[in-house]
Amino acid sequence: KRGEIITFEAPSKSYFSAAEADLENPIAEYNYNINNVFSKFRYYVLEIGKESYIKRVIGLPGEHVKIENGKVYINGEELQEDYLEPTVETDSLNGPFTDIVVPENCVFVMGDNRAQSTDSRRFGCIPLEKIESTVWIRFWPLNLFGKVD
């Protein structure tokens, strides 16, 4: 359901944009653009080993998700995201998936750290069969240890 935090199998290389898919050598990419080396490295790690991501469900199957002017809209209505810090704005991250209808049997996910999150804005919707679990307790940081709402 919307607002739940889930874990899911991280997308493979094929999920990422065509511009990133052209990369063959992360070292050469480092020499070309040092600012993106860590995101490019993560991209290769995803292809090599199975990892899990943890994100919040934002859009459900059949819903129209749009990101505009720092806000998320579901079917034209602004999404109230009380779980975010008031200063957090949501931008497109120049991702291709910021105005879409969520396909059947998929969800649109986003991280709460919106400015740094690799999520559905970047790699698209997650098939329901890729969901591994629902998060219900937080261990870290210790000052936030407890049940996740």
Predicted region positions:
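Extended hydrophobic leader/signal-anchor segments used for secretion and membrane insertion
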Residues: 1-149
